[in-house]
């Protein structure tokens, strides 16, 4: 699958990111049992495996889908190219925006 060029705007505070040095997120792949609250589902949780299936990501490509988390084994904030988590969405109370983009390394 081609993931380059995809981006999302999230609430930095909800993602645990601030302007402080060393404030960061974690990117890895899907882990068995992963859950998230997909944007648009009003806080209802869903298995990541079901979300990837519904997005028609071929089974052979699912292990390479970038998963952005709050930390190692942390809460999922973005399934890159598929869906953001409801808990990380921007709201009227959002004070700091976080734009995440996928780019190909040189």
Predicted regions and their residues:
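Basic, glycine-rich polyanion-binding accessory segments appended to enzymes
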Residues: 1-106
């Amino acid at each position: 699958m081609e993931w380059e060029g995809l981006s999302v705007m999230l609430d930095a505070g909800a993602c645990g990111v601030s302007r402080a040095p060393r404030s960061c997120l974690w990117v890895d792949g899907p882990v068995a049992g992963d859950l998230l609250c997909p944007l648009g589902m009003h806080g209802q949780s869903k298995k990541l495996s079901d979300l990837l299936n519904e997005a028609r990501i071929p089974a052979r490509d699912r292990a390479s889908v970038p998963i952005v988390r709050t930390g190692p084994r942390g809460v999922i904030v973005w399934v890159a190219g598929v869906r953001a988590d409801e808990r990380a969405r921007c709201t009227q109370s959002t004070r700091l925006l976080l734009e995440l983009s996928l780019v190909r390394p040189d």
